Amino acid sequence: MKATLLILLTCILISCSEEQESSDLIDTDLNNYKESIKTNEYDQDSNDEDDSVSGNKNTNIISSSVKTDAIKELQNCSDFNDSITTVCKEINYASTDNTRQTLNLWIPCKINECSNKQYPVVIHIHGGGFAFGSKLKFPKYNFLKNEIAFASINYRLIPQGQFPVYLHDAKAAIRWIRGNSSKYHIDPNNIGIMGESAGGALTSYLAFTNEIKELIIDDTKVNIEGNVGKYLNESSKIQAAINYFGHADSKKFCSAKMGLDPNCNEKSTFCFACTSPISYIGKSSSPVPYMIIHGTNDTLVPYEHGKLLFEKFSETYLKNQPELSLITIQNGGHGNWDDNTSNKLKDINTNFFVRNLKNDKEIPYEKTKTIISECAKTKSSANLCNEAMK
């Protein structure tokens, strides 16, 4: 099983190295991340970009001398000067000193003015082939304006973070948020997840394993929940999930990327099944609203993976099916989409979480939708787009 894991991880690394384009939607700047780990710290206050979660220009954090007493009681929290937002940085959800087990949290109120209100929360999981990436890079959505809190997490990466370690970390982050929900004004009954690429796959694992501690997949026992952190009595259940171009079937993924013989030996098949999100559909009795967003010209994780997840989910939950959507980005690659497409997705994603975490059922949804993307800005993506339009 370990040998096949190495094959899968090598496959993912090759995929990640093939296309490292910047994106208006998802920022996966590998060079910046490498610089951050060289210094062994994240200089979050030096970022001059817009505050992508709140939609406000990034403002200076007020000094500790003028923080309210309420904020002092919380871990690493400060007010933004020009918004009704509290940000809590570098919180370790695993009770360790590992920076790969930390989260940042934005709350849509000033702590001393929140009264007893609790907010739904969306947790973002970054991509990077389980080999790199950072919680500092996340989609540019205006969740706070819709009174939805937002968190972005790190998780352990390979070689330390092999499957299912990163799943255990993500579940620990959810349990930490639920265990501290009253303190941080979070609604523990309305937690959403979203992620791209590797983070999209991890989002799918979470969506398909609600309330499951362990499973047998092709005669192999898989520890789903893990025992990371102090909040083991809390639930890691989520209520809604969005998967951006995460893979469905590890075997198909590696066969496509490395030319592997699809007729793997029996031992390898066990491993590929265990690391395939599609293997977990139907295992939980508590399916959640699930959205898939995938580009038709994705050469890293082909569009076929999004369709496989959509079809398997549809077939499995014929009765009492939760909300299910497949958003197809025609001509779209592995992210790196044009501004018009990105702006449309902002509305789609915000509406999805408002509808399912705030129970606003008046907001309509479409089970399938196609957005035609313009040619991407980078040369390789533009060539793909041009080929598709011939």
Residue spans for each PLM region:
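Bacterial Sec-dependent N-terminal signal peptides
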Residues: 16-70
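Short beta-strand element of the alpha/beta-hydrolase
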Residues: 117-127
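Short amphipathic alpha-helix adjacent to the substrate-entry channel of hydrolases
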Residues: 135-151
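Alpha/beta-hydrolase active-site loop
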Residues: 162-181
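Short beta-strand/loop motif that positions the catalytic acidic residue
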Residues: 292-294, 298
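C-terminal catalytic histidine-bearing segment of alpha/beta-hydrolase fold enzymes
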Residues: 303-310, 314-390
